[in-house]
């Protein structure tokens, strides 16, 4: 599978997947007076739709989520219904000083939840998570594949 960086948003996409969601939208921002008028809404959407990479190695499923500005106490990693990995978090606004004169407020607050159905080969009881520099890493070890038992048969004659 060939992965290339997208020139329309910096995300990665599979160039051979006709159903890839990473497509250029020529009408994005069309109904707003200015393309910049939609920027704060896009920032909120970027937070509420936290970007998560999921890769599979021979030993584990590894999830990496970009959560800039969040502390590990503001993030939850849970398993629901036995095989649904849920990553959620909440960013709150700082206390505003009513007497201050604000020139610009761009940082957003909000909640996000991302859910992933884990495959049958995931070891749910051994999931580990860590967070460093705003990047959450979740490692889900895999059950080793059972190799078929091969028995050699002597050929007589």
From Swiss-Prot:
Ranges for domain sHSP: 43-157
CC terms in the record's Gene Ontology section: cytoplasm
Protein keywords: Cytoplasm, Stress response
InterPro entries: A-crystallin/Hsp20_dom, HSP20-like_chaperone, Small_HSP
Primary location recorded for the protein, binned into one broad class: cytoplasm
Places the protein is found: Cytoplasm
Taxonomic superkingdom: Eukaryota
Family to which this protein belongs: Belongs to the small heat shock protein (HSP20) family.
Subunit record text: May form oligomeric structures.
Protein name (Swiss-Prot/TrEMBL): 17.6 kDa class I heat shock protein 3
């Amino acid at each position: 599978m060939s992965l290339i960086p997208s020139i329309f948003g910096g995300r990665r996409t599979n160039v051979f997947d006709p159903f890839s969601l990473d497509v250029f939208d020529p009408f994005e921002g069309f109904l707003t007076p200015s393309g910049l008028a939609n920027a704060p809404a896009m920032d909120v959407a970027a937070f509420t739709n936290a970007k998560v990479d999921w890769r599979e190695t021979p030993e584990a499923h590894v999830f990496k989520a970009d959560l800039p500005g969040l502390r590990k106490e503001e993030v939850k990693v849970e398993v629901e219904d036995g095989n649904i990995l849920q990553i959620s978090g909440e960013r709150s606004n700082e206390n505003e000083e009513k007497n201050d004169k604000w020139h610009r407020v761009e940082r957003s607050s909000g909640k996000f939840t991302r859910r992933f159905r884990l495959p049958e080969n995931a070891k749910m009881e051994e999931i580990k998570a860590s967070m460093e520099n705003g990047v959450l890493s979740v490692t889900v070890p895999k059950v080793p594949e059972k190799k078929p038992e091969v028995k050699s048969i002597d050929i007589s004659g």
